[in-house]
Amino acid sequence: MSAWRAPEVGSRLGRRVLWCLLWLLAGVALGYVAWRLFGHTPYRIDIDIYQMGARAWLDGRPLYGGGVLFHTPIGLNLPFTYPPLAAVLFSPFAWLQMPAASVAITVLTLVLLIASTAIVLTGLDAWPTSRLVPAPARLRRLWLAVLIVAPATIWLEPISSNFAFGQINVVLMTLVIVDCFPRRTPWPRGLMLGLGIALKLTPAVFLLYFLLRRDGRAALTALASFAVATLLGFVLAWRDSWEYWTHTLHHTDRIGAAALNTDQNIAGALARLTIGDDERFALWVAGSLLVLAATIWAMRRVLRAGEPTLAVICVALFGLVVSPVSWSHHWVWMLPAVLVIGLLGWRRRNVALAMLSLAGVVLMRWTPIDLLPQHRETTAVWWRQLAGMSYVWWALAVIVVAGLTVTARMTPQRSLTRGLTPAPTAS
């Protein structure tokens, strides 16, 4: 009897050793990332602005009135562009020295990027079973998330830029992902999205996802969450809230020069053309409406096909393309996008989606944005103008290809996982 059991015992021990070695590999990857991120104390300009905005609120100074600009050590004078509630939530950073604040925002971003990637993998039901790795599926997906995020942090432009600036785009993305991807949420679905909208209006585009899913409860919850959070901002910063919502919000030009090559959207592309403001605005509205129509068409088709994760990606890319400002570090959504379309491309034997996933990785690793000369964008030749919009072209391709090629046709792989989809209509 013992001789018969011995191979099973040895096999079990071997699997455990393999699992330990895999986590050792993940630890080495995270160690390398930490060395790259913390090997020296970098200056992250956006966390500096967050700190100064929080200090202004704590000191009772205006955040926006009179065209307030905050002076940075590198000579740039920048405004605080978020609602007053954000300054309130940034206040813990105000109590830290700049190096400590840089470390804090970097650690927070890294943890949330791993967590959000693991949630995306769970929503896709990636790696559901394994004969070699004796661990729950959630731990396997967490390990896989670490192995995905580690190189992305260093080598993929939107992700590395987000870390370099000390931005909160990953925080906002995580708030959306935890509301839209899981099958169930421990809070009323839409609550986290509403908080994200209160921190920065751009996540409001994800209301379209709930509306097309006919999940009115989640949409109303998001609106209620946004209203309560904004009201809290008025309670804690009445003058700044009034100034922001009645005046500052409408002046998108204060965010930065739209013609910069890193502004990856329709508005940025039009700003690089020598046309008048009225013509530029009309073209932006027309282009945005066309992209909206294409996105709704694509989302309806992929939702009918039972792929809500892809619908979330479509609306995320739509928001980036039509937003008045979409700096390249706002495009952190490209990471979950390549994961979703890559895995769905494999499951559905959809070569177009798989190739778009690969193209997305290539664009992030060797970005053509730099082919558009910085600060000389408006005089660049036509092919540089086109190449400099690479993220926009890729996003539009994903939306169109998703709508054209993802159908309700069942495959063996998909039939096994049809119940594992995010955001059911009832929370």
UniProtKB/Swiss-Prot annotation:
The keyword Nucleotide-binding does not apply. It is an enzyme of class 2 (transferase). InterPro entries: GT87 (IPR018584). Its EC number is 2.4.1.-. One of its GO terms (biological process) is phosphatidylinositol metabolic process. One of its GO terms (molecular function) is alpha-1,2-mannosyltransferase activity. The chain crosses the membrane at residues 18-38, 101-121, 143-163, 191-211, 218-238, 279-299, 308-328, 331-346, 351-371, 386-406. Pathway: Phospholipid metabolism; phosphatidylinositol metabolism. The keyword Cell membrane applies. It is found in: Cell membrane. Keywords: Cell membrane, Glycosyltransferase, Lipid biosynthesis, Lipid metabolism, Membrane, Phospholipid biosynthesis, Phospholipid metabolism, Transferase, Transmembrane, Transmembrane helix, Virulence. Signal peptide: none annotated. GO terms for cellular component: plasma membrane. It holds the Pfam family GT87. It is a multi-pass membrane protein. Belongs to the glycosyltransferase 87 family. Responsible for the addition of alpha-(1-2) mannose branches to the linear mannan core on the biosynthetic pathway to mature lipoarabinomannan (LAM). This is Polyprenol-phosphate-mannose-dependent alpha-(1-2)-phosphatidylinositol mannoside mannosyltransferase. It comes from Mycobacterium tuberculosis (strain ATCC 25618 / H37Rv).
